[in-house]
Amino acid sequence: MDSFELVVDAISFAYGKGQPNIFSELSFSVKAGDALALLGRNGVGKSTLLSCLMCFNHVQKGHIYCNGVDLISASIKERAKLIAFVPQIIGADIAYTVRDYTSFGATLRTGMFSSPSKEELEKTDAIMEMLGITALRHKPCRDLSGGQRQLVAIGCALLQDTRLLLMDEPTSALDIRNQVIVLETIEQLRAQGYAIIFTTHLPEQALLLNSRVGLCRGGSIDFYDSVSDVTLEALEAVYKTKLSLFYSDTVNRTVCVIPQLGQKGM
């Protein structure tokens, strides 16, 4: 894949005039092959930041550049060629088949009511094969498990043919097996050169992916180039809870973060 960079330049956002900023003067960047995990408690602005990057929410200050294109002033169609969004999970009542829903991602680049071309349908089939959902191609999405629906949502985003994927709590409400499937897919995409930003409440998911980390405190984000640079004290300050880290000699790194019981927080 070619070179790629997202640059977030001193953005500030509040939900209304006179309201406190969710974040202020926030700057960071991600490049091809980066996975950035945004960690933090509920309500600290993780999902809000993704919404600002997608321009669903409009920042009051700053700029967001994707390969030199200012996303804030770009058209919806221009943004759809640069950045793709994977929601927490697609609706359980979606009647589209897996193949139809996955191929919908291609129409976001060309027009909401356009039909996918033969080439785009061939790419749909290739992406379903990569994600291991080919056998489900004729099945309605509403009949899928949560993990299967999440893979379909990732497939739809990949059909946009962008270099940047934003994933909001991609493993929320999934059992352990399906969490592993989704996390392995994220790692596979990162290795292929995609830039990925995902939100999570769970530090161990960043540990598994050995990703970059942004600790969201509410109003600010502390960035680390490696999850190994994040200290126990920093995690406890973010989650306001005493934690225990478990180290694995097999992989030579911390693999699990568990809260200590018997305390109501710091």
PLM feature spans:
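Conserved ABC ATPase "signature" region
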Residues: 103, 118-136
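Catalytic Walker B motif of ABC-type/P-loop ATPase nucleotide-binding domains
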Residues: 165-169
